[in-house]
């Protein structure tokens, strides 16, 4: 695999198994029952070459090609075509019609693309959007589904001086403006080997030949791109894909797609498991069987053990087992994957004393008397160390510190951000332990610890709440509240009379036959939350803000933007349900 890439694997598959189905996409916007479209390996490779030829007419090797297209097979062709042309692909989401997408605008200005790849369905809207963007030059707009890109082209594309960077994965920007992570072709190959070695450890890193990737995750997100596009090519597997909207409209589609696929392997963030468990009816799953499922990765956001339990319990009747659940840790700066418990072992939840965690130390306690945290197993590759971020000295076992990563899956850095690249990707250990490299290390910004040789994660350094001089992790408080409300929560600290106080923003549905009854239920919810936070965390809440679903600002991957929550709270911009 030394000189291999996603493109060389695609070419090989098109030659060896040209007529085998590679990618399928089910479109539920055309028809509620779904319209399924497919591509064989030969079709995919030919269309990729055609897009690459067209791109060469509009730019040069190392130019950027931004992808602004709806989720679908054309998005995959655009992504692969950009890399095939020697361009650096930049996967993004389509801006909402009639609005200015701050993130997309910032990325266009940052990358100065030669070409924007889109589809005929949204080309006019994209052209207008790009015309008003702050770019040095106006990029060409290329429709990937144009008829003339579907003809056979006999000539080859020669990449004599191709860039090492395959694509720019723009971060979701939960704590800052988005930055383009420079993911290389080698990063992809190495990270794929790492995740295979861990997820399929019982079979020596080898998956069943008829494994099917099932995914609705957006292609512009790291997990959606690697799982939905890259992994099927590298593994030679078939894929069953759809859009995030299709999943949100009807979560049962995800379960049904897995149950009707051979040896399905899938992934989703925590909220997806919650939605599927709550909004899938008995009729939806009648006659289905998940017994052949190879695993479902849970990642991208804080994983709540109670959610995984609800999912496992809900679908146990169709032979889903809790050892099929794969809680995983990763980040775009490490391509996508960093650590997970191996397939075949049930998720392990360990309880820790909250007071000790607040002090930065670790002490296990009896079940359900402390803060529940998921184990992410014993990290092997990449190398993981817990480090004191101030002294750059490794923390002893049982001490909370910053998670640092070292390995060939770690990206090159941030696009056109040398200082931030050095700060994040250039970590060096002081007095490293035997066998531990001095550097360079990726400083993840995540807080975690090692207990009994296993990795646990407590939250983001920048999100740490300091209330009355003590550290508290917002995810722990949010988890406590979610057990009561089931909706999205943001725990933030705000200055009140020169002291940091705890405020929680909570999404709930207003229920009741009358306004008086609805208000009575909201008061009961607030009382239950106040008592739970006091009991579990020893904290008084300065303000409980109950808001309608969809009020809390999030990133494109669904993570809560706590900094934005603080700003909205200070400006009194939340619409309170209780007046």
Swiss-Prot record:
Coiled coil, from the record: none
CDD domains the record matches: FAAL
InterPro entries for this protein: AMP-bd_C, AMP-bd_C_sf, AMP-dep_synth/lig_dom, ANL_N_sf, FAAL/FAAC, FAAL_FadD21
Signal sequence range: none
EC number: 6.2.1.-
GO biological process per UniProt: Actinobacterium-type cell wall biogenesis; fatty acid biosynthetic process
This protein's GO CC annotations: plasma membrane
Enzyme class: ligase
SUPFAM superfamilies attached to this UniProt entry: Acetyl-CoA synthetase-like
Keywords: Fatty acid metabolism, Ligase, Lipid metabolism
UniProt superkingdom: Bacteria
Keyword Ligase (UniProt): yes
Lipid metabolism listed as a keyword: yes
GO MF term list: adenylyltransferase activity; ligase activity
UniProt similarity note: Belongs to the ATP-dependent AMP-binding enzyme family.
Name of the protein in its database record: Putative fatty-acid--CoA ligase fadD21
